[in-house]
Every structure is written in structure tokens, then in C-alpha cells.
């Protein structure tokens, strides 16, 4: 008799995706972040569901409902901090996952890569709307500033902003719709993750060498299930340490003050995981130019497959590209730091140089490095 996992229609799908899936024998720990992102999504949806049971999306009660969750609900403080810091964990894993994709040339699986970019946009939208919900000072002013950027769109900008706000300012209608979207988007993300995996399993995983691994495959279970489990244990240990000992480290103290439209905080800034894009936005003095640069800072990921000039897929044996890659990582860290600083010298010029360097490395230097390496390696 056939084993049930190979014959049952539902189990068969799970079997092909997580048990009998042929995987390259040499994929490193950098390939763990896919499963860790799945874990992050489960943590966020679960904790978010329990928060939604006690949260009220009304401007008069939103702030106090979050306080009520922390003070009166059983382990409400824990659920709230898991959810708030879970977003940071999500983006750490997300950025490492993207970085691995760039380093090892995984972007040449174009369909998987493009779905990944859509997933990144959806996750960023979800995180932004979630940050507005506690209705603290930074929530309110962050929502006002970021939604206002759409007014830079010629002709339809102002109408578009008022349509999103549901009025002439960020108010009750805005909060209610943001809550609705923040609730539904994670489920759309989960559906898109399925599509992401579908495309990935069409081609199979890439590997650190960037060469075809058809001749050397091993089953996903038990090898990579146990490896993923180790990653999960390490991640959860670090995460819970952070949640229980430093829950407010990444948050903004301003968000412990209720939203007040008559009092602007001295420095309006988004959460840390958006600071690099915020720095790029601020480095251009023109409003529309800044918005375009902001969108392009993420959309530029889509050109990686088009600008791959090297004859080798992975950067493993390409020292010039490696140097540029780590320069890009350092540049993103500088942009993240600048995004959290006030708009004054010397931060303005540092941000502008870092923004130019970001696009320069991706669009010009990496493709040139690929061509040079082809010559050097006589590939």
C-alpha cells in the first residue's frame, strides 16, 4: 500500500513541498531565512489576531485600548511586545534573505524574485499601517507625513491623498481603513508566499556555488527540516530574550504620548527598518524627486536579473563583486543611521553621497565588475 503522504491529495502537496523535495546538498545557513520568514509570518498573524480581539480602531479609544491590552489583558503586554518586535525580526530576516539572494545570484530565478519584490512591498505597506494603529504621536505624524508624499503626484496627488485619508486630514476614517487593511494584508502575503514557493519549486533551490545541482540532491526531510529547526530555536531564543529584556529598544518614546494634531514631534521618523528609504527620500530637495527615489530604492531590486553580466552566477569566486556587495551593505547601514538623524549638516551631505552610492553600485559598478571578472577569470 502506498504511504498516505504520497497518495492523499492534501498530504501529497505537503510531501512534495517539505518532505520529498529534492534539495541541493550544499546549501548553507543563509538558506534558513525562507523558513524563518514563514515562522515570523505565523508569529505576526497569531499575535495580531489576539491583539485585534481587544483593539478598537477609533481615534478616541485606540490609544487607551492599547494601554488596556498591556495593563488588563492576561499576558497582553507580552502579546503586544511580541507583535511590535516581531515586525523588526521580520524585516531583519527579510533583508538577510534579500542580501543572500543578491550575493548568490538567486535573482536569476526571475519569477520567484519578482514575487519576492511584491512580497516586500506588501510587507512594508502592512508594517507602515500597523505602526499607525496605536495612535501615538509618531503613529499620527508618521501617517500624515508618509501619506502626504502622494500629493507630489502631478494633477491627481491632492485628490488621492484626501481619498486615502477619507477626509481633509488623518482622522477616524483613516485609522479605521488602516486597521482593515492591516488585518487583511498578512493573509494576502500568506497567499503570495504560496505563489513564491510554487515558482521556487519549479526550478529548485540555488546553492552557494551557483552551479546546477541536479546530480547531487538530497531529500528535504530529515536533512533540512532539522537544519531549519535549529535556525528556529536560535531565532526564538534571541527573539524572546529581546522581547522580555529590551521590549522598547526599537520603539519611539513619542509613541507613548497620545496623538495630538496640534503638537508636532521635533523629529518625525519611521521605524528603523524604513530609515534607509527615508534617508534616500530626504536626500533629494524636490518632493516629487524624493518620492520617485523612495520607490526606486526598492524597485531597483527588479533590475538585478537584467544587469547580471558575470558568467558565474554566485559572487563566491568574484572578489571585485564581493567588495562592492559589502560596500553596498555598509552604505545601507549608513543610510539607516542618517534616516534617524535631523536634517542638518553634516548629515544632509552624508545622506546624499550614500544615496548616490547606493544606486551607483547597483546600476553601474556591479555590472561593470561582472564584465571585468569575466576577463580576469578568462571565463
Curated annotation (Swiss-Prot):
Q: Pfam families under this entry?
A: Cytochrom_B_C, Cytochrome_B
The protein's required cofactor(s) are namely: heme b
Which residues are noted in the entry as heme b b562-binding? 83, 182
Q: Where does a ubiquinone bind?
A: 201
Q: How does it sit in the membrane?
A: Multi-pass membrane protein
How and how many cofactors are bound, per the record note?
Answer: Binds 2 heme b groups non-covalently.
Q: Where are the transmembrane segments?
A: 33-53, 77-98, 113-133, 178-198, 226-246, 288-308, 320-340, 347-367
Subcellular location(s) of the protein: Mitochondrion inner membrane
The job of this chain, per UniProt, is described as:
Component of the ubiquinol-cytochrome c reductase complex (complex III or cytochrome b-c1 complex) that is part of the mitochondrial respiratory chain. The b-c1 complex mediates electron transfer from ubiquinol to cytochrome c. Contributes to the generation of a proton gradient across the mitochondrial membrane that is then used for ATP synthesis.
Q: How does it assemble?
A: The cytochrome bc1 complex contains 11 subunits: 3 respiratory subunits (MT-CYB, CYC1 and UQCRFS1), 2 core proteins (UQCRC1 and UQCRC2) and 6 low-molecular weight proteins (UQCRH/QCR6, UQCRB/QCR7, UQCRQ/QCR8, UQCR10/QCR9, UQCR11/QCR10 and a cleavage product of UQCRFS1). This cytochrome bc1 complex then forms a dimer.
Give the PANTHER family listed for this entry: CYTOCHROME B
Q: What is this protein called?
A: Cytochrome b
Organism this protein belongs to:
Chaetodipus formosus (Long-tailed pocket mouse)
Amino acid at each position: 500500500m502506498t504511504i498516505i503522504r504520497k497518495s492523499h491529495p492534501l498530504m501529497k502537496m505537503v510531501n512534495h513541498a517539505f518532505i520529498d523535495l529534492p534539495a541541493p546538498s550544499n546549501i548553507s545557513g543563509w538558506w534558513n531565512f525562507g523558513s524563518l520568514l514563514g515562522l515570523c509570518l505565523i508569529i505576526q498573524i497569531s499575535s495580531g489576531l489576539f491583539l485585534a480581539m481587544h483593539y478598537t480602531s477609533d481615534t478616541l479609544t485606540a490609544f487607551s485600548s492599547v494601554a488596556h491590552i498591556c495593563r488588563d489583558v492576561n499576558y497582553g503586554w507580552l502579546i503586544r511586545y511580541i507583535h511590535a518586535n516581531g515586525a523588526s525580526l521580520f524585516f531583519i530576516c527579510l533583508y538577510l534573505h534579500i542580501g543572500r539572494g543578491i550575493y548568490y545570484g538567486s535573482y536569476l530565478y526571475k519569477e520567484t524574485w519578482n514575487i519576492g519584490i511584491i512580497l516586500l512591498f506588501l510587507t512594508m505597506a502592512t508594517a507602515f499601517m500597523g505602526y499607525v494603529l496605536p495612535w501615538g504621536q509618531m503613529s499620527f505624524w508618521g501617517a500624515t507625513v508618509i501619506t502626504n508624499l502622494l500629493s507630489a503626484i502631478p494633477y491627481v496627488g491632492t485628490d488621492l491623498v484626501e481619498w486615502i485619508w477619507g477626509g481633509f486630514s488623518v482622522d477616524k476614517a483613516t485609522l479605521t481603513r488602516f486597521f482593515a487593511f492591516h488585518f487583511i494584508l498578512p493573509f494576502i502575503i500568506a497567499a503570495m508566499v504560496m505563489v513564491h514557493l510554487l515558482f521556487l519549486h519549479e526550478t529548485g533551490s540555488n546553492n552557494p556555488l551557483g552551479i546546477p545541482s541536479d546530480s547531487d540532491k538530497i531529500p528535504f526531510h530529515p536533512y533540512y527540516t532539522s537544519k531549519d529547526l535549529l535556525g528556529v530555536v536560535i531565532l526564538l531564543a534571541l527573539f524572546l530574550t529581546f522581547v522580555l529584556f529590551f521590549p522598547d529598544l526599537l520603539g519611539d518614546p513619542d509613541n507613548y504620548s497620545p496623538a495630538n494634531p496640534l503638537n508636532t514631534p521635533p523629529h518625525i521618523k519611521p521605524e528603523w527598518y524604513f530609515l534607509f528609504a527615508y534617508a534616500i527620500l530626504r536626500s533629494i530637495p524636490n518632493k516629487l524627486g524624493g518620492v520617485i527615489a523612495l520607490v526606486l530604492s526598492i524597485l531597483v531590486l527588479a533590475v538585478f536579473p537584467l544587469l547580471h553580466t558575470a558568467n558565474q552566477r554566485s559572487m563566491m569566486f568574484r572578489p571585485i563583486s564581493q567588495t562592492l556587495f559589502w560596500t553596498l551593505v555598509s552604505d545601507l547601514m549608513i543610510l539607516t543611521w542618517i534616516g534617524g538623524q535631523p536634517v542638518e549638516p553634516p548629515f544632509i551631505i552624508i545622506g546624499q553621497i550614500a544615496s548616490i552610492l547606493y544606486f551607483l553600485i547597483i546600476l553601474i559598478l556591479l555590472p561593470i565588475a561582472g564584465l571585468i571578472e569575466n576577463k580576469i577569470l578568462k571565463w
